[in-house]
Amino acid sequence: MSSGERVAKVVLVDIEGTTTSISFVHDVLFPYAKQNVEKFLRDFWKEDDIKHIVQDLKQVPKFADYKALLSAPPTEVDVELIAGFVRYLIDQDLKVTPMKTLQGLIWAQGYANGELKGHVYEDVPAAFEAWRAAGLRIAVYSSGSVAAQKLIFGHSLAGNLQPHLSAYFDTHVGHKQEQQSYENIAQQLKEDPKQILFLTDIPGEAAAARSAGLQAIILQRPGNAGLADDQKASFELIPDFKPLHNLKLPINKSQA
């Protein structure tokens, strides 16, 4: 099925490499979190939500591995230890939910004080408008926390895009290369999986979504990873959202 012939009721978008450049995430957001995590923890260490995040971080299996790497492991959990562990997780690109939650809080400060603006590709706002006008819902599924997702779209270079978005999903619903995650999303959206179109840059995510019954298209944005020949043969590939501007709702047979 070509892009121009597709119908759907929901467009489910990934962020990194799909709506937003990978370089923004890796070259702007991650370094900002690394640079500011220790100060943020010192400022809010006694707040209940931070205490809960710290407790969750201590339960991450990699926490013991990280402490074993230290020449002089501390006898108690303090700001410096947790900040170092978060920087370690970021460097390893490990998508750990409490770390993502903490990153989201740090980024919230950056967006609020104007130090950060969310990058979106120039074709994204027009696509969002077209899909909404056609009656489709738009949802987001990213490994970044829901809070972080809302910040990117709420403080984007194109302004506040949140009014276009009806739902957000992160790793609380499951990991992105697992079929069950997409089944969970379809259930939460109360939608037939085949009426959901998932847009991503990762073949493993597209395969997991398709195995759950969703439609899936892979974005080949500048800077995205190259694809093997079998991956190119398995999925429809598009360079941006423009081929999908005419996406429509399925025809209601009772009205046809």
Curated annotation (Swiss-Prot):
Residues in coiled coil: none
Recorded metabolic or biological pathway in which this protein acts: Amino-acid biosynthesis; L-methionine biosynthesis via salvage pathway; L-methionine from S-methyl-5-thio-alpha-D-ribose 1-phosphate: step 3/6; Amino-acid biosynthesis; L-methionine biosynthesis via salvage pathway; L-methionine from S-methyl-5-thio-alpha-D-ribose 1-phosphate: step 4/6
This protein's UniProt keywords: Amino-acid biosynthesis, Cytoplasm, Hydrolase, Magnesium, Metal-binding, Methionine biosynthesis, Nucleus
GO biological process, one term: L-methionine salvage from methylthioadenosine
A GO term, aspect molecular function: magnesium ion binding
The keyword Cell inner membrane is assigned to this record: no
The record's free-text note on cofactor binding: Binds 1 Mg(2+) ion per subunit.
Known function: Bifunctional enzyme that catalyzes the enolization of 2,3-diketo-5-methylthiopentyl-1-phosphate (DK-MTP-1-P) into the intermediate 2-hydroxy-3-keto-5-methylthiopentenyl-1-phosphate (HK-MTPenyl-1-P), which is then dephosphorylated to form the acireductone 1,2-dihydroxy-3-keto-5-methylthiopentene (DHK-MTPene).
Quaternary organization: Monomer.
Protein's name in the database: Enolase-phosphatase E1
Organism: Drosophila simulans
Upper classification of the organism: Eukaryota, Metazoa, Ecdysozoa, Arthropoda, Hexapoda
